[in-house]
Amino acid sequence: MRSWPAPEVPNLPEAGLPGPALPLHLHDTATGTVRPTRPGPTARMYVCGITPYDATHLGHAATYLAFDLVNRVWRDGGHKVCYVQNVTDVDDPLLERAEQTGQDWRELADREIALFRDDMTALRILPPDHYVGAVEAIPLIVEMIERLRSRGAVYEVNGDLYFPISADPDFGRVSGLTTEQMLPLFAERGGDPQRRGKKDPLDALLWRAQRPGEPSWESPFGPGRPGWHVECSAISIHHLGMAFDVEGGGSDLAFPHHEMSASHAQVATGRHPHAKAYVHTGMVGLDGQKMSKSLGNLVFVSRLRADGADPMAVRLALLAHHYRSDWEWTGEDLPRATARLERWRAAVQLPAGPPAAAVAAEVRRHLSQDLDAPSALVTVDRWAEQALAGAGERDPAAPAQVRAVVDALLGVAL
């Protein structure tokens, strides 16, 4: 599947701003601690993508922006990055929306994926190296289920195939939840704990046998379509192998999605862990509730753009909140970010400004500490204020260098 065009990223050492390669520290849900990432020459990251029936709301945008920062910090540190993102282009919510609106599910998915690409391009999100739809990955998914079956980790309930969580001794490590905590979340987030015939209420669907009126694909275990969690297991290990550096997504994916996909991969390969770190973004709310498709309380990037918002102001509005925080979008976020963007743009157009080396060092330091983007923005604010006031030492190279820092590390074009 085609992703979207990559924005050019300035090379800061070439711009005269070399700096120590600070190790990126991220909060790992599995351990509950902020730990250094220690990638090899090529950092490997998998981020769960959209189910394309309502793209792109600000909750989506905040998540992909957070992992865009991860990508940029690693690249600034001299790493190559192999970034994989999926698209769940066949799943119950998509099929239900298509039926409700009288659309062909493929046309709905194609339209929403195209809109998502446009939004990611406008927000200057670095594209994944592998952008993989569930439909195109069905051969990989079938192979994964066959591997699980060869290890005795598949059973049937009325033609549907399930994964027994008892097959993975590490089940529960990703989320750290108890069974009592898992059960209601499993029911709320696409699971079927009440289904009769399952060995454990938490066992996850691997393959849904063909139903009338639903799309299906041939497989060694009969026509049907894949479950949600095994999709990401198959795609991630095919492109990244096991023990890749970061698996990411919204905090509502920690359980069951990341928990289940890790167990599938670990049992299928006999290796642990699926990912070295599980990194999750907070929820963006509106009117006191999480912004979500099911609730319908969505603010869309495309609507903000259509109403005249500068995409860089939208990006700054999101960067002003720490990626792990739960926060509420209000009518003040965008005007505040627009004013900040205008100040920064005015400052970098000056013939000289305070030296940029300290700005680069501070922004790098803040981002290395669990992506503290809000503090990084304050660093640039201080420089812009001093530059506009004509205060302190003046360096004619500084405005262009600060523009490069803001572009390379924060992804904001000034």
Swiss-Prot record:
Motif 'ERGGDP' region, chain ranges: 188-193
Keyword flag DNA damage: no
GO cellular component, as recorded: cytosol
Cofactor(s) needed for function: Zn(2+)
UniProt short sequence motif 'HIGH' region, positions renumbered to this chain: 50-60
Biased segments, Low complexity type: 11-38
Name listed for the protein in its UniProt record: L-cysteine:1D-myo-inositol 2-amino-2-deoxy-alpha-D-glucopyranoside ligase
Name of the gene: mshC
